[in-house]
């Protein structure tokens, strides 16, 4: 009787460890593509200089095209950059 209970405990332990390992693998696969996606996005303002105040209201000096303006980079990258028509 004790050997049956011991065998059941070992099987339960092995099953628990195997399922938790699979869950960790799924989590690792979920996070990686998101960072690759953000890294692949084109960064606007690479040929521009943004002369700004603290709230990103200023002028841009760009090689091309005309009509660029200063804007916030966003929550993940604080600061300002030039946003130009057709560059996103």
Curated annotation (Swiss-Prot):
Known tissue expression: Expressed by the venom duct.
Modified residue annotations for Threonine amide: 87
Keyword terms of this UniProt record: Acetylcholine receptor inhibiting toxin, Amidation, Disulfide bond, Hydroxylation, Ion channel impairing toxin, Neurotoxin, Postsynaptic neurotoxin, Secreted, Signal, Toxin
Annotated localization: Secreted
PTM text: Contains 5 disulfide bonds.
Signal peptide: 1-20
Other observations noted: Negative results: shows no or weak activities on 5-hydroxytryptamine receptor 3A (HTR3A), and alpha-1-beta-1-delta-epsilon (CHRNA1-CHRNB1-CHRND-CHRNE), alpha-3 beta-4 (CHRNA3-CHRNB4), alpha-4 beta-2 (CHRNA3-CHRNB2), and alpha-7/CHRNA7 nAChR.
Domain notes: The cysteine framework is VIII (C-C-C-C-C-C-C-C-C-C).
Job description of the protein: Alpha-conotoxins act on postsynaptic membranes, they bind to the nicotinic acetylcholine receptors (nAChR) and thus inhibit them. This toxin shows high activity on alpha-9-alpha-10 (CHRNA9-CHRNA10) (IC(50)=9.79 nM). It also shows weak activity on alpha-3-beta-2 (CHRNA3-CHRNB2) (IC(50)~1 uM), alpha-6/alpha-3-beta-2-beta-3 (CHRNA6/CHRNA3-CHRNB2-CHRNB3) (IC(50)~1 uM). The toxin binds to the same or overlapping binding sites than conotoxin RgIA (AC P0C1D0).
Protein name: Alpha-conotoxin GVIIIB
Organism, as annotated: Conus geographus (Geography cone)
Taxonomic placement: Eukaryota, Metazoa, Spiralia, Lophotrochozoa, Mollusca
